Regions:
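Mature N-terminal segment immediately following signal peptide/propeptide cleavage
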Residues: 1, 6-24
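Intrinsic disorder/low-complexity segments
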Residues: 11, 22, 42-49, 85
Length: 200
């Protein structure tokens, strides 16, 4: 059973491919035996490649791979599958999502793919540009943002939430406990290490 983000990934792919190619693309639960297929998600990928593995991908790692009978777009977790779809649309078809209301979706009636074998795990676990338009859940997911300020629902694969968010220096490193032994961890004001009203 596909997760909400994997279902959303397939729907987004079909929507954008329809815009790009100018013809209908449908989401199907079973592969078409006479046409090339795009396999979205790790379970679908195993239909195309029986030894397909998500080992080492974590929640957000992606695989974009051509196979003899089509294309695999899958991730280590549901959010990873969504990111695989958006990365494919961006890197191989030229889509861009500039803001929640402005995007570039090119017209390509014919799409030819060379061999692709991409396996990528994001270097940064938490990605959150902090500006109003970035809080839009669709824009955030399409641009692979996953911070707690974004309006990301289950269909977007959720988000990372860290306790404290901001203004957390003293709760994390209480000066009563650490200042005497590690003054270098605290602000230097006019050449003096201080902890009174010196941190956010």
């Amino acid at each position: 059973d596909a997760q909400p983000a994997e279902k959303h990934a397939a729907t987004e792919l079909a929507t954008f491919l329809t815009q790009i190619a100018g013809g209908p693309f449908a989401v199907a639960a079973e592969p078409n035996q006479t046409l090339a297929n795009i396999y979205v998600g790790p379970q679908a990928a195993k239909i195309a490649q029986s030894d397909f593995s998500t080992d080492g991908l974590g929640d957000e790692g992606i695989v974009i791979r051509t196979v003899p009978n089509g294309l695999i777009l899958a991730g280590g977790g549901p959010r990873g599958t969504l990111y695989a779809v958006y990365t494919f649309l961006e890197d191989h078809l030229g889509c861009r999502w500039w803001s929640s209301s402005e995007s570039t979706i090119p017209s390509k009636p014919t799409v030819v793919l060379n061999d692709i074998d991409v396996r990528y795990v994001p270097v940064l676990e938490y990605r959150e540009p902090y500006w109003f338009d970035a809080f839009d859940g669709d824009w955030a997911a399409r641009n692979k943002c996953n911070g707690q300020g974004h309006r990301l629902r289950a269909e977007h694969g959720g988000k990372h939430i860290y306790e404290g968010f901001v203004h957390t220096f003293f709760p994390l490193i209480p000066p009563q406990k650490y200042f005497a032994d590690h003054p270098e961890w605290f602000s230097e004001i006019d050449g003096q290490r201080k902890h009174e009203r010196a941190q956010l």
